[in-house]
Structures are given as C-alpha cells and as structure tokens.
Amino acid sequence: MADFQKQKVQWFPGHMAKTRRQIKEMLPLVDGVVELLDARVPYSSANPELDSLVRGKPRIMLLNKCDVADPAATKRWIAAFAAQGKTALAVDCRSGKGLSAFLPTVQQVLKKTIEKNTQRGMAGKPLRLMVVGIPNTGKSSFINRMAGKNRAKVADKAGVTRQNQWFAVGGGIELLDTPGVLWPKFDDPEVGDRLAFIGSVKDEVTDLETLTCRLLEVLGRTRPQAIIQRYGIEVDEYMQGWEILEAIGRKRGFLMRGGEIDYNRSAVIVADEFRGGKLGRMTLELPE
C-alpha cells in the first residue's frame, strides 16, 4: 500500500467511443445541450471534448448534487461560469432542489430559437435538448425528475439508437438521453482521482484501497475536521492516507483474524460515506 501514489486512474471502454460518435451525429436534431456536472468537482466532471463536440449549441450546465457540495464554493463556480458566458444552475436532481429554475432558464437561453420558430410559423414547436455528462453525474435522475414517474417516451427520431431515447417533460421541451461518456485520457492525474472519488470511474477498474488512501490524504490536508468528526480519530496534515485508513479501520473494529486491519472493508465504507455526503458538504476544487 505504500506505493499508492504511483498508480494512475484511466478508464475509457469501447462503448464510450461509440457514444461520442453518436452525440456528434445527433447534434443536428437538437436546439441545445444540458450538461450535468458534479457540484463537488465542476472542473473535473466537465468533459473537455464537449466544447468542440457541441459546436456552439446553446448550453445549460447543471451543477448536480449541490446538497453534498460546499454552497459557498458552488456560488463561486456559478459566478466563474457566468464570467465565461456560460449559464449554470445549482441543483439536486434527486430531491428536485433548484430545478424550478430550469424551464425559465431554457426559455431565456433558447430565446433566439423560440423567436425564429415563431417567425417561421412554428410557434410552440417543442424545444429539443440533448442531456450529456460523464457517468454518475445524475442524468437519469434529472430526466426522471423532469418527466415525472409516468415519463412518456417521445417517438424515436431518425438516427437515434435504442440507447438514446427522447422524453417529453412538459413546458414544450423534449429531452434526449445519452449514455455517460468520459474522454480517452486524463492528462491531469488529479482529475482522474477526483472522478474516481465521486464514483464516475468504476471501482472495478481501480484499486479501491489505493483510491481511498488518496482521498483521505487530500481530506487530511484540506478538511481534517471532517474526518475527525465522522470517525473520531486524531488526524493531522502530515499523516499519510494509509495511516488514516488504518486508524479508521481500527476505530470501527474492522479487524480480520489475528487482529489485522481489514483495509478493503474500511476503504469501501469510507468511499461510500464520502460519496453519500456523510463526511459533510465539501467541494474538492475551486475556480481559478
């Protein structure tokens, strides 16, 4: 476990390359794009290939899971995006928090499209939006919340595969669901780590013990009080991740035969509790 710093996170299965091609092919069918980001890592969860893929389509960014992110940091991110001319909303798609602003925002961002439709005698034409994002950012939760329990699939459009379905969500809006897609290589290893921390990279393709040690080392430097309050152990900024994980395992009684720490069980618990917000509301990166 001592060499955990040397391992890098990478994950780009073949189906993601296919999804990327499908997104490009389906863009002519939509009026705009809704991008789901994780509010805890807005930079790392933004696919850097999207700007070139969407080719200038109007875009709305949803900073999802804002309920487990630092609210002050989320405000800073929204302001930073606004300074770049991008529209961003803080939402929690599971509870519906913040989504009341979505329809009015669509009307505002797609104002020119609506006016153009009216001039062409197509007033009331449904606005079609493609929903994109990396895995585990909440695209399905967003569509389920917007469409309701009895969500109605719109008839398949030309060029749309069975994995990419349209849903009518009211307000004259149709959403096109797409599978989560990453990009081929994380140039910054910290981006790969953060995506693995939040579960956007499958645990099966990482060493969860190694990953959790990295997470605990980050939190030990930046949010030691969160670890202290949750696990009742002493932490300082000089402790290595494996030392913190060991202390947590011992405190929780995760022991194997002979009194050895069960590192895997400890890692699973810490990762799950971090992702579920049980260590408190926190954001792992801030805008420059």
Task: Label the predicted regions.
Residues 1-33, 40-49, 53-59, 66, ...:
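Helix-rich effector regions associated with P-loop NTPase G domains
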Residues 97-99, 134, 139, 160, ...:
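Gly/Ser/Thr-rich helix-start
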Residues 67-132, 151, 254, 261:
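Canonical P-loop GTPase G-domain recognition
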Residues 113-117, 144, 150-156, 222-227:
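Short, structured loop/turn "capping" segments at alpha-beta junctions
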